[in-house]
Protein backbone atom coordinates (compact mmCIF):
# COMPACT_ATOMS: atom_id res chain seq x y z
CA UNK A 1 0.00 0.00 0.00
CA UNK A 2 0.97 3.65 -0.34
CA UNK A 3 3.29 4.99 2.32
CA UNK A 4 0.70 7.53 3.42
CA UNK A 5 1.75 9.50 6.52
CA UNK A 6 -0.42 8.37 9.42
CA UNK A 7 -2.20 11.01 11.46
CA UNK A 8 -0.42 11.04 14.79
CA UNK A 9 -0.19 13.29 17.80
CA UNK A 10 2.37 13.79 20.51
CA UNK A 11 1.63 13.97 24.23
CA UNK A 12 2.43 17.31 25.86
CA UNK A 13 4.03 15.85 29.02
CA UNK A 14 6.48 13.82 26.94
CA UNK A 15 8.08 16.93 25.42
CA UNK A 16 11.01 18.90 26.83
CA UNK A 17 9.44 22.33 27.12
CA UNK A 18 11.98 23.57 29.67
CA UNK A 19 14.97 23.55 27.33
CA UNK A 20 13.52 26.28 25.11
CA UNK A 21 11.75 28.28 27.83
CA UNK A 22 8.39 26.85 26.89
CA UNK A 23 8.92 26.88 23.12
CA UNK A 24 9.84 24.11 20.70
CA UNK A 25 11.18 24.63 17.17
CA UNK A 26 8.87 23.12 14.57
CA UNK A 27 9.99 21.91 11.15
CA UNK A 28 7.09 21.78 8.69
CA UNK A 29 7.33 19.29 5.84
CA UNK A 30 5.02 18.71 2.89
CA UNK A 31 3.38 15.35 3.61
CA UNK A 32 3.34 14.39 -0.07
CA UNK A 33 6.61 15.71 -1.52
CA UNK A 34 8.54 15.63 1.81
CA UNK A 35 9.96 19.06 1.00
CA UNK A 36 10.76 21.24 4.03
CA UNK A 37 8.37 24.19 3.93
CA UNK A 38 9.21 26.38 6.91
CA UNK A 39 10.42 26.64 10.50
CA UNK A 40 8.29 27.98 13.32
CA UNK A 41 7.83 27.69 17.07
CA UNK A 42 5.09 26.25 19.25
CA UNK A 43 4.27 26.50 22.91
CA UNK A 44 2.02 23.93 24.54
CA UNK A 45 -1.11 25.93 23.71
CA UNK A 46 -0.17 26.22 20.03
CA UNK A 47 0.36 22.47 19.90
CA UNK A 48 -3.02 21.82 21.51
CA UNK A 49 -4.76 24.16 19.04
CA UNK A 50 -2.97 22.50 16.12
CA UNK A 51 -4.02 19.03 17.21
CA UNK A 52 -7.59 20.09 17.84
CA UNK A 53 -8.18 22.24 14.74
CA UNK A 54 -5.90 20.23 12.40
CA UNK A 55 -4.56 23.59 11.14
CA UNK A 56 -0.90 24.23 11.94
CA UNK A 57 -0.68 26.99 14.54
CA UNK A 58 2.45 28.61 15.94
CA UNK A 59 3.48 30.95 18.72
CA UNK A 60 4.77 34.28 17.43
CA UNK A 61 7.80 35.38 19.43
CA UNK A 62 7.55 38.93 18.07
CA UNK A 63 3.79 39.41 18.61
CA UNK A 64 3.66 37.24 21.73
CA UNK A 65 0.53 35.42 20.61
CA UNK A 66 -0.71 32.36 18.77
CA UNK A 67 -1.09 32.58 15.00
CA UNK A 68 -2.48 30.06 12.57
CA UNK A 69 -0.46 29.83 9.38
CA UNK A 70 -2.51 31.41 6.60
CA UNK A 71 -5.00 33.10 8.92
CA UNK A 72 -4.92 36.18 6.65
CA UNK A 73 -3.77 34.84 3.28
CA UNK A 74 -5.79 31.63 3.38
CA UNK A 75 -2.62 29.64 2.70
CA UNK A 76 -3.15 27.31 5.62
CA UNK A 77 -1.29 24.13 6.47
CA UNK A 78 -3.57 21.13 7.02
CA UNK A 79 -2.08 18.85 9.67
CA UNK A 80 -1.30 15.27 8.72
CA UNK A 81 1.06 14.14 11.48
CA UNK A 82 3.26 15.41 14.31
CA UNK A 83 6.32 13.65 15.66
CA UNK A 84 9.03 14.61 18.13
CA UNK A 85 12.74 14.01 17.67
CA UNK A 86 14.77 11.66 19.86
CA UNK A 87 15.45 14.40 22.44
CA UNK A 88 11.78 15.46 22.56
CA UNK A 89 12.80 19.09 22.05
CA UNK A 90 11.97 19.54 18.34
CA UNK A 91 8.79 18.76 16.42
CA UNK A 92 8.38 17.55 12.85
CA UNK A 93 5.01 18.47 11.39
CA UNK A 94 3.82 16.88 8.17
CA UNK A 95 1.15 18.98 6.50
CA UNK A 96 -0.63 19.58 3.23
CA UNK A 97 -0.33 23.23 2.22
CA UNK A 98 -3.13 25.18 0.60
CA UNK A 99 -1.18 27.53 -1.62
CA UNK A 100 2.39 28.79 -1.17
CA UNK A 101 3.88 28.58 2.31
CA UNK A 102 6.41 31.41 2.02
CA UNK A 103 5.18 35.01 2.40
CA UNK A 104 7.11 35.78 -0.81
CA UNK A 105 4.71 33.53 -2.72
CA UNK A 106 7.09 30.59 -2.93
CA UNK A 107 6.28 26.97 -2.24
CA UNK A 108 8.82 26.85 0.59
CA UNK A 109 10.75 29.33 2.70
CA UNK A 110 13.86 27.34 1.74
CA UNK A 111 15.39 26.75 -1.71
CA UNK A 112 14.73 23.37 -3.26
CA UNK A 113 17.48 20.83 -2.70
CA UNK A 114 18.78 18.76 -5.61
CA UNK A 115 16.63 15.68 -6.09
CA UNK A 116 13.50 17.13 -4.49
CA UNK A 117 11.79 17.31 -7.88
CA UNK A 118 11.30 13.54 -7.80
CA UNK A 119 9.14 13.91 -4.71
CA UNK A 120 7.14 16.66 -6.39
CA UNK A 121 6.74 14.50 -9.51
CA UNK A 122 5.55 11.56 -7.40
CA UNK A 123 2.95 13.82 -5.76
CA UNK A 124 1.82 15.10 -9.17
CA UNK A 125 1.43 11.56 -10.51
CA UNK A 126 -0.62 10.66 -7.42
CA UNK A 127 -2.83 13.69 -8.07
CA UNK A 128 -3.31 12.62 -11.69
CA UNK A 129 -4.26 9.13 -10.51
CA UNK A 130 -6.92 10.57 -8.19
CA UNK A 131 -8.37 13.25 -10.44
CA UNK A 132 -7.86 11.71 -13.93
CA UNK A 133 -7.85 15.02 -15.88
CA UNK A 134 -8.62 14.75 -19.58
CA UNK A 135 -5.90 15.19 -22.21
CA UNK A 136 -3.27 13.96 -19.74
CA UNK A 137 -0.75 11.32 -20.80
CA UNK A 138 -0.54 10.15 -17.20
CA UNK A 139 -4.32 9.70 -17.06
CA UNK A 140 -4.19 7.70 -20.28
CA UNK A 141 -1.59 5.40 -18.77
CA UNK A 142 -3.65 4.78 -15.63
CA UNK A 143 -6.73 4.01 -17.72
CA UNK A 144 -4.76 1.44 -19.75
CA UNK A 145 -3.97 -0.46 -16.56
CA UNK A 146 -0.99 -1.94 -14.75
CA UNK A 147 -0.08 -4.39 -17.52
CA UNK A 148 0.40 -1.61 -20.09
CA UNK A 149 2.27 0.60 -17.62
CA UNK A 150 4.59 -2.29 -16.74
CA UNK A 151 5.18 -2.85 -20.45
CA UNK A 152 6.19 0.80 -20.82
CA UNK A 153 8.62 0.47 -17.91
CA UNK A 154 10.17 -2.54 -19.65
CA UNK A 155 10.46 -0.67 -22.94
CA UNK A 156 12.03 2.36 -21.30
CA UNK A 157 14.41 0.12 -19.36
CA UNK A 158 15.66 -1.49 -22.56
CA UNK A 159 16.02 1.89 -24.27
CA UNK A 160 17.95 3.22 -21.27
CA UNK A 161 20.30 0.24 -21.36
CA UNK A 162 20.87 0.63 -25.10
CA UNK A 163 21.61 4.34 -24.69
CA UNK A 164 24.19 3.42 -22.08
CA UNK A 165 25.79 0.85 -24.36
CA UNK A 166 26.19 3.24 -27.29
CA UNK A 167 27.57 5.84 -24.86
CA UNK A 168 25.48 8.79 -26.02
CA UNK A 169 25.03 10.83 -22.85
CA UNK A 170 22.11 12.99 -24.02
CA UNK A 171 20.18 9.89 -25.08
CA UNK A 172 21.01 8.16 -21.79
CA UNK A 173 19.70 11.12 -19.80
CA UNK A 174 16.52 11.35 -21.89
CA UNK A 175 15.78 7.64 -21.56
CA UNK A 176 16.61 7.67 -17.84
CA UNK A 177 14.10 10.47 -17.31
CA UNK A 178 11.44 8.51 -19.21
CA UNK A 179 12.22 5.39 -17.17
CA UNK A 180 11.96 7.21 -13.83
CA UNK A 181 8.64 8.78 -14.81
CA UNK A 182 7.06 5.52 -15.95
CA UNK A 183 8.38 3.70 -12.88
CA UNK A 184 6.69 6.26 -10.62
CA UNK A 185 3.44 5.78 -12.55
CA UNK A 186 3.73 1.99 -12.14
CA UNK A 187 4.29 2.32 -8.40
CA UNK A 188 1.24 4.54 -8.06
CA UNK A 189 -0.85 2.17 -10.18
CA UNK A 190 -0.01 -0.54 -7.64
CA UNK A 191 -0.93 1.70 -4.69
CA UNK A 192 2.71 2.37 -3.83
CA UNK A 193 4.88 5.47 -3.85
CA UNK A 194 8.44 6.47 -4.63
CA UNK A 195 8.95 6.85 -0.88
CA UNK A 196 8.17 3.14 -0.43
CA UNK A 197 10.98 2.22 -2.83
CA UNK A 198 13.34 4.63 -1.05
CA UNK A 199 12.47 2.96 2.25
CA UNK A 200 13.64 -0.38 0.82
CA UNK A 201 16.90 1.23 -0.33
CA UNK A 202 17.44 2.74 3.11
CA UNK A 203 16.86 -0.64 4.77
CA UNK A 204 19.42 -2.25 2.47
CA UNK A 205 21.90 0.52 3.20
CA UNK A 206 21.81 -0.29 6.91
From Swiss-Prot:
HAMAP family tied to this protein: HisE, HisIE
InterPro entries: His_synth_HisIE, HisE, PRib-ATP_PPHydrolase-like, PRib_AMP_CycHydrolase_dom, PRib_AMP_CycHydrolase_sf
Enzyme class: hydrolase
Compartment annotation: Cytoplasm
Family from the record: In the N-terminal section; belongs to the PRA-CH family. In the C-terminal section; belongs to the PRA-PH family.
SUPFAM superfamilies (alphabetical): all-alpha NTP pyrophosphatases (SSF101386), HisI-like (SSF141734)
Organism: Xylella fastidiosa (strain 9a5c)
CDD domains: NTP-PPase_HisIE_like
Keywords (A to Z) from UniProt: Amino-acid biosynthesis, ATP-binding, Cytoplasm, Histidine biosynthesis, Hydrolase, Multifunctional enzyme, Nucleotide-binding
Enzyme Commission numbers on file: 3.5.4.19, 3.6.1.31
Spans annotated as Phosphoribosyl-AMP cyclohydrolase: 1-117
Functional pathway: Amino-acid biosynthesis; L-histidine biosynthesis; L-histidine from 5-phospho-alpha-D-ribose 1-diphosphate: step 2/9; Amino-acid biosynthesis; L-histidine biosynthesis; L-histidine from 5-phospho-alpha-D-ribose 1-diphosphate: step 3/9
Name the record gives this protein: Histidine biosynthesis bifunctional protein HisIE
